[in-house]
Amino acid sequence: MVTIGNTHDDLIHDAVLDYYGKRLATCSSDKTIKIFEIDGDNHKLVETLRGHEGPVWQVSWAHPKFGSIIASASYDGKVFIWREENGRWTNIAQHQHNASVNSVVWAPQEYGPLLLCASSDGNVSVVEFKEGGNCEATTFAAHDVGANSASWAPPAVSGSLIQPINGKASNNIRIVTGGCDNLVKIWKYDPSSKTYVIEETLSGHKDWVRDVAWSSSVLSKSYIASASQDKTVIVWTQEGNQPWKKKLLQDIPFPDVVWKVSWSLSGNVLAVSGGDNKVTLWKENLTGEWESAGVVEE
């Protein structure tokens, strides 16, 4: 286990390992991003990235096939794209929203170098990063009061272990968003209009949806988890083209606001974290019920 000490001057909001688990990016209310090299239980700070004018909420590593690249999202309404070359990190591109950018995540590599952003201005944007630092954004209104989180669907369809035929993943892109309207929304890319159109609106929460996560599992069902300020987590499932079904992760509310949901790489274990400073792990049993798989206390 690697413990990062007092390297930031304020709260740390996100910490993400790169594809190989060799580098860690952290971001903080001190307006900086820090890059660490990880070697076993040891770590070394190698770079501090500055430029944001507000708290940095989230960071995301691009797949290494696109280079050594991270994106950062900040309260200042900006998304920065940073690239490392010859040991030096530089800010190579920027993307602007009209309010805090709360979520930023690179797409699965099959979709290409696409960046998904959710903002308090109510909009969600998908930014295509091009060589030379140029970016082309598709922006659409998603949640009237503000968008808090967004997540990519896996590139293969549920029920299949293969990728889309002819590799045309761009024709099958779907995303899920969560917002301050208490709703979870599923969007699909429409090649004819070159934008994202609403495919499904899922209602079930009674307060802001703080986080959404689409499981990478491509077996019999699609899974989406949503975490809310109403102290609940809902797992939404879909088999084939059937309607989405909702199920509370547990019948009683969590002790505090639920801030974050995250699926394991295999897509079958769900981690839940909230205001009670605990991380709980959950797994679906053979009857479709969700059972506790452990607790991590801070």
Swiss-Prot record:
GO terms, biological process: COPII-coated vesicle budding; mRNA transport; positive regulation of TOR signaling; protein exit from endoplasmic reticulum; protein import into nucleus
Cell membrane recorded as keyword: no
Any one annotated GO CC term: COPII vesicle coat
Matches recorded under InterPro entries: Sec13/Seh1_fam (IPR037363), WD40/YVTN_repeat-like_dom_sf (IPR015943), WD40_repeat_dom_sf (IPR036322), WD40_rpt (IPR001680)
Organism: Yarrowia lipolytica (strain CLIB 122 / E 150) (Yeast)
Membrane topology qualifier: Peripheral membrane protein
Source superkingdom: Eukaryota
WD repeat boundaries on the chain: 7-46, 51-92, 96-139, 142-197, 204-246, 253-292
GO molecular function, one term: structural molecule activity
Protein name per UniProt: Protein transport protein SEC13
Purpose: Component of the coat protein complex II (COPII) which promotes the formation of transport vesicles from the endoplasmic reticulum (ER). The coat has two main functions, the physical deformation of the endoplasmic reticulum membrane into vesicles and the selection of cargo molecules. It also functions as a component of the nuclear pore complex (NPC). NPC components, collectively referred to as nucleoporins (NUPs), can play the role of both NPC structural components and of docking or interaction partners for transiently associated nuclear transport factors.
Family recorded in the similarity comment: Belongs to the WD repeat SEC13 family.
Pfam family, one: WD40
Subcellular location: Cytoplasmic vesicle, COPII-coated vesicle membrane; Endoplasmic reticulum membrane; Nucleus, Nuclear pore complex
Keyword terms, alphabetized: Cytoplasmic vesicle, Endoplasmic reticulum, ER-Golgi transport, Membrane, mRNA transport, Nuclear pore complex, Nucleus, Protein transport, Repeat, Translocation, Transport, WD repeat
Gene expressing this chain: SEC13
Complex formation: The COPII coat is composed of at least 5 proteins: the SEC23/24 complex, the SEC13/31 complex, and the protein SAR1. Component of the nuclear pore complex (NPC). NPC constitutes the exclusive means of nucleocytoplasmic transport. NPCs allow the passive diffusion of ions and small molecules and the active, nuclear transport receptor-mediated bidirectional transport of macromolecules such as proteins, RNAs, ribonucleoparticles (RNPs), and ribosomal subunits across the nuclear envelope. Due to its 8-fold rotational symmetry, all subunits are present with 8 copies or multiples thereof.
PROSITE patterns, sorted: WD_REPEATS_2, WD_REPEATS_REGION
